[in-house]
Amino acid sequence: ELNDNILIKVESNVLREWTDKVLMAKNDVSFEISESNFVCSASSTELGKVIHSEPMNGKRIDTVAVRENVNITLSFQATKSMLIFSNCGEMFIIGFSNQQPSRLKVELGDGSYLCLYVAPKNKKEK
C-alpha cells in the first residue's frame, strides 16, 4: 500500500490551472510542497521559470494529511497525464510522495473511483 507524504483535496479546475500553467514550459515539473505552501515550477529557454505557488489550507487546497515535505520532479508527460486526468471528475484527492508514485484519485459515485499513479523522476535522471 502507498503511504503518501502529503495528501490534499482539490477541485478539478484547480488541478487543471496548475498543470496547464507549468506545462507551458514544455519541460519537467518540480513540486515543492510543505505544510504551509504548494509550489510547482518548470523552466524553459523561451519563458524562463514558470512558477505556481499558493498556501496550503487556503481557499483552494484542503490538506488531508502531512507526514513530511515533498520535493519531487515529474516528467513533462506525467504532468500532462495529470492535466488530462483532471477532466474525469470534479474533486480530486492527490497523494504526493518522495519515494513512491504519487496518485490522483477521483470518486465516480456508488463507491467506485478512478486512480492515476505517476512516478517521480529519479534524482539521476534530472
Predicted segments, located by residue:
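DNA polymerase processivity clamps
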Residues: 4-56, 60, 64-126
